[in-house]
C-alpha cells in the first residue's frame, strides 16, 4: 500500500530542498519526523508538513498503521521561477530570481 502527497510551487530552491530530502529518504516515518523537527533548515519544516499530510492520507484513506510506514520515495523537482526587478541607481534595474520547487512524497508499509 502506497500513499502519496504532493506540494507544488513551494518558495524554496530545489537544491536546498534536496539536502533535506536526502536525509530522510528510506527512513521510518517516526524517525523522519524527529529528524525534521530539530533540523534548522527552512526546507525541513515544509517537508515535515507534507510528511504529516501523507501519513494522515494513509491513515484515513487506506487505514494504515502509522508505526509500520516508511518513506519509500521523495523527490524534489524544479518549479517555475518568479522573476522580480530590484531598482538600482541611474534608472537601472537588476533581475532577482525567486526559485520554487515541487515536492513529491510517497509513504508505504513495505
UniProtKB/Swiss-Prot annotation:
One BP annotation, GO: translation
Single annotated GO MF: rRNA binding
PROSITE patterns referenced in this protein's UniProt entry, alphabetically: RIBOSOMAL_L22 (PS00464)
Cited InterPro entries: Ribosomal_uL22, Ribosomal_uL22_bac/chlpt-type, Ribosomal_uL22_bac/org-type, Ribosomal_uL22_CS, Ribosomal_uL22_sf
UniProt entry keywords in alphabetical sequence: Ribonucleoprotein, Ribosomal protein, RNA-binding, rRNA-binding
Gene3D superfamilies listed in its UniProt record: Ribosomal protein L22/L17
GO cellular component, one term: cytosolic large ribosomal subunit
SUPFAM superfamilies (alphabetical): Ribosomal protein L22 (SSF54843)
A Pfam entry, by short name: Ribosomal_L22
Subunit structure: Part of the 50S ribosomal subunit.
Protein family: Belongs to the universal ribosomal protein uL22 family.
Function according to Swiss-Prot or TrEMBL: This protein binds specifically to 23S rRNA; its binding is stimulated by other ribosomal proteins, e.g. L4, L17, and L20. It is important during the early stages of 50S assembly. It makes multiple contacts with different domains of the 23S rRNA in the assembled 50S subunit and ribosome.
Protein name, as recorded: Large ribosomal subunit protein uL22
Species in which this protein is naturally found: Nitrosomonas europaea (strain ATCC 19718 / CIP 103999 / KCTC 2705 / NBRC 14298)
Gene: rplV
